[in-house]
Structures are given as C-alpha cells and as structure tokens.
C-alpha cells in the first residue's frame, strides 16, 4: 500500500508520455491518489481500463496540471518530442515523477526528509548505501528514482522517514519545487551530451539537485573536476552548507562490497549525509559493515582456481572503468559494445593494470585501435561466450588473479541492458565453476 490518501490529487489532471517501467508505475500512482490521467506511448500504449484513465494520443494538453515524460524521452535535445513542444506552446509544466512525489508527500502533511544523489558515476552505489544505513538504523526509509523503483511508486513515509532519490540529469531538468534536505553531486565527466548539448549544459542540469536549498540543508560535492568545483562555489554563495570531498584525500575503505579508492568517496558522501540527518556513529558503523553492495558494480560473482570474476557491467564509460582498473593490480579485462564519445583514450594511465584485453561487441575495433597504439595485448573475441573462457585461460596461464568485465561501452548491440549483460557474464562464470574447476559462486546464496 502506498499510504497516500486516495483523494490527494482529486481534481488534478496529468498527461503521461512513455509507458515503460517508470511510466506505468507513474500512471498507477497518480490514479491511486485520485488524479485523472491521460497516457500514451508511441510504441506500446497497452494499459488495462481503469476509472479516471484515458489511453489516447496526447494531442491537446489544455487543463492539464503537468506533463510527465519518461526519463528517456527528450524535451529539448537532440530533438524534442512533439508532446514536449505542445506542452510549451500550451503553457503546461514538464515535470519528473520525483517532483510529483515531493509535492504529494508535502501535501499529505509528512515532514519526511529528502536526500538526492547525482553524479556521472557512483550515484547508484551511494544511493543504496545511504538507504541501507537508515534502514539498518531503524529509520523508515524508501529509495528509488533512477535506481530501481520509480520515485512516485514509493510509499508515504512518516515525519521521521527518509526518501533517498537517485537523480539522473534527465530527472533534474524537470524539477520545480523539489527541495532536498541533503544532496550529493559526486563527480562530472562527459556523458549524455546529445541530450544536453555540451558539457556546460550537462553540468547545469546536474546543478539543479541543489535548487531550493537553504542554510539548514547540506550539499556534499566531490572536488575532483572543475565543473563540480565551480558548482560548489555557486552553492556555497547561496548560504547552503557545503562539504567538499576530495577522493585522493580520503582514506580508502577496505570493505569487500566497496573495493577501490573511488568507493571511499561514495562512502564519505553517504556517511556525511547520514550524520547530518541524525544517525550516530555506532549506527553508521553497523550499517556500513553489513552493506552487501550492488549488482553489476564491481560485484564478485565467482572464484575459480584462484581467479576472481568481477562483474562491473554498469561501467559503460571510460571514467567508470578507470575506477575499476585502479581497484586491482592486474586484470584480464573484458570490454566492448557500443563505444561512447571519446572512446578509451583517457584510460591510457590505467593500461598498466591490464595484462590482456578481450574485446566484444560492435565497436571492438575502435577499442583495439587504441590498445594497439599503447602496446596493450588484446584478443578479438566478439561475444562474452568466447571472451570469458579465453580470459580465464589466460589468467591461469599468466597467474593473473582477476577477470574483470568493465565494458566502457553501452550494451544495446548485443544485450537488452547493462543488467542483461552482467547476468550473461554471471551465467558464463557459473558454467565455468560447474565444469569441474575448483571454484565458488558468491552470488548463489543471494539467488537461492
């Protein structure tokens, strides 16, 4: 049960465009709060008939409270969806479901705290860790947004509750009154530039996470790039409390679920925010020790004959892969898919961690050209099914302790998503373990 009053949004009308996982959840939540909804999806507009729901093309938005676009639908760049142009022409706000959640919580009378987490990399881990800290401490807590559950599908929390919302740049562009009691910007490196025009546009979108904050609120900002440093200065000038995190100055966290120096920054951000919102040191320490980590993010999925298999399928850009490579002395590296702008040239300082690369996907040649320039040995494997056994054999032959899937590329050439890619990797590793090698599958207990 959502806990929101069934008449909370009575008299309000919403247009919802995009009926994937997020959009469908938004429709159900709005209907559950008494709103009228007109919904449409250009590809699949199949929803069961319900009171107050109209499934029809969005050709007239007159009288609508707002248009809620699914995150993947552009409202400006690279080309605005026609319904976004229509909304602007008719003076209708374009909002994210996180904005509607905030309004619904406050309209319900709850004073629950809001935490917003963003950044190019690390935001899912940090979001999950913050939520884990509050949950293990016994505080009512709900986490979602870009991670897992759609924001508007989260339940109503009491006054001492905490919402932890992972915010993508797409969501942040569509906020209005949303006011975080604590917000975190971990880092900024080029990503989604087709949606934001350039790096300045991307940074401006991310900076919205600090909108509406005041002197009692906390902004935690990573200081490892010029964009974040500039935003920190701007936020501090408004009187908001700013805590600056320098990854190189933080002591590394050695917990098995959070390997690598980059996770020290994620941990630092989570601990700072948890403390600001009332958790004591003992509760934080207890939660930190029991945090299991996230799937597809430096996740150890198997160990065979002394070789660890690490699933980092979420690492779809070079910046994320740099953190993974830095976490290990030497690896057999599996990479490839649909290359991102800039390729992997920026990984050159980390190539010393690669004993050999095993390339897959449509842009394997692009990665191969860079590796060849820098003298990094590689094999063209084409698929994960060929790459994983080849990397394992090479690891045994060369006494390398880690096979790392950290693709530096998008997955949609061969897989439905990065999760699908990671799951395929896990299955292949599991087959290797079952083939007679002396190995273990650390994920097995979670699945049983």
UniProtKB/Swiss-Prot annotation:
Q: What is its main location?
A: cytoplasm
Q: Which UniProt keywords apply?
A: ATP-binding, Cell cycle, Cell division, Cell shape, Cell wall biogenesis/degradation, Cytoplasm, Ligase, Nucleotide-binding, Peptidoglycan synthesis
A biological process term (GO) from this entry:
cell wall organization
Enzyme Commission code(s) on record: 6.3.2.9
Taxonomically, the superkingdom here is Bacteria
Q: Which enzyme class, named as a word?
A: ligase
Q: Where in the cell is it found?
A: Cytoplasm
Q: Write out the pathway annotation from the protein's UniProt entry.
A: Cell wall biogenesis; peptidoglycan biosynthesis
A single cellular component GO annotation = cytoplasm
Residues the record lists as binding ATP: 119-125
Which reactions is this enzyme annotated as catalysing? Answer: UDP-N-acetyl-alpha-D-muramoyl-L-alanine + D-glutamate + ATP = UDP-N-acetyl-alpha-D-muramoyl-L-alanyl-D-glutamate + ADP + phosphate + H(+)
Q: Which Pfam families does the entry link to?
A: Mur_ligase_C (PF02875), Mur_ligase_M (PF08245)
Q: Which SUPFAM superfamilies match?
A: MurCD N-terminal domain (SSF51984), MurD-like peptide ligases, catalytic domain (SSF53623), MurD-like peptide ligases, peptide-binding domain (SSF53244)
Family listed? Belongs to the MurCDEF family.
For this entry, the protein name equals UDP-N-acetylmuramoylalanine--D-glutamate ligase
- What are the leading ranks of the lineage? Bacteria, Pseudomonadati, Pseudomonadota, Alphaproteobacteria, Acetobacterales
